[in-house]
Every structure is written in C-alpha cells, then in structure tokens.
Amino acid sequence: MSAPRDIPELDAASLEHLEAIARRAGEAILAHYRADQPAELKADRSPITAADRAAHTVITEALAAWTPEVPVVSEEGALPDAQVRQAWRRFWLVDPLDGTKEFIQRNGEFTVNIALISDGEPVLGVVFAPALDLLYLAGRGLGAWKRQSRGPAQRLLSHPLPPGTPLVVAESRSHPSAELEQYLTTVPVKSRVRAGSSLKFCWIAEGKADIYPRFGRTMEWDVAAGDCVFRESGDGRPRTSPLRYNTPGLDNTGFIIGGPASDD
C-alpha cells in the first residue's frame, strides 16, 4: 500500500495504485452482480443497487487513506455546496458504478469511474468494466492505456482524421435522442455502435469509434474518467475536449467528443 499523500503524483506508481482501487471496487460489484439483487429508486428516480453502495465505500475509503487531504465527490455520497467546491484546486470525482441500467440488464457494460480533477481538468483517470475484465487508465503526460484480463497494458494512440472521413459513431445504449438523430444528418456516418457507461469515451481513445455526440444532461462523474482516457490518447499531444469540471451544478448540457475537430 502506498504511503498517504496530500496530492498524488502524476506518475506510473499512481496509475498502478488507481488501478488497484478500481479493481477492488470491481470485485465488490461482481459479488452483487452474481447474486442478482434487486434495484431501488433514488429520489431522482434513477436506479441504485447494493453494488453501487459497496463500490462507493471501497473507493472513498481507499482514496481517503491514500490522499487524505484531497476531497472526494461521489455520485453516491453527500455533495458539497458549490461555494465550498470552488475553493478546491484538486478533488477526486467518482462514479462507483456507471451504467446501473446496464448492470440491471446484465449486459456487462457498466464501469467503475475514478478521476482526479486539477484546476477544472481530469489529470488521472481509470475506467474499469469488471464483468468484461477490461480496464482503461490514463494520466496527464503518461498516456492512455488499455489492459484486458490483466494482460500487458497497451498504449492507446490516436491519429487525426481528415475532414470528410466517414465516421463510426459511438452512442448511448440507454439514452437515444431526437437531437442525436438530427445531428447525424449533418456528418458523414460510416456506422453506429452502442454501449453503456463511459466505455464510449474509451472506444474513441482506442480508435474503435471516431465520434461520440451526446445531447442532454450528464453529470461530471459520468464522464471525467473516460474524458481523461480520451484526452491522453493523443499522438504526442493531448486531445482537445470541450468538458470542464467543478461547475456549479456538476453537470454538462451536452458535448461532442472526437471527430476531426478534436485534433485541430
């Protein structure tokens, strides 16, 4: 176990530690996944399961032990007031189980998302799909990496897309929208692929898809870790993302990730 730190270093050791935390949370999730336990509804009518709560406990306790002076914001925890958060330069942003609908549907497309936010941008991030044993990891200046079934990590390197290239579009499995359909009439589309959770960001990073347009509201913990993987997949320089973090509502109104414009 790494010694407690006030601020995690942006180094390989921190990536390894972050991976270990995500895998521990994944183990907690899979214990409930195999038990096929029922879901409940939160006040906002979104689903929550015992797996969400178990992963939240694993992650928040591990982060508090590792970086005790860095605040943690988790979807399943108490949310600090915006005025309090505006004084933070760095904080952890966590979705313990992103894709609860996918968890309930038992299609494997749910993830553990953990990101370190520094001055409004994600600088460390891990996305782990425990049912698929698939992990994506990134850090500022450290690149983006993919690891399948605890095999060797593979570096993810993107290349700019020439204008007019027919695009493979990543889209949400659970959130179709008329706005998306309208947008897709304005760009050349080669094919469309669907997935749950933050895997869509990772697909852009590894070149499995070219663009991920999302319309409608999302929360920052839904996207931060995947956004970090996307940003650090650039070939020699970070990729440009429209997303910023620690906004007053901790939310986004829509975004387009990838495509030729992301590499300008």
Model-assigned labels for residue ranges:
Residues 38, 71, 168, 188-191, ...:
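Conserved beta-strand segments of alpha/beta enzyme cores
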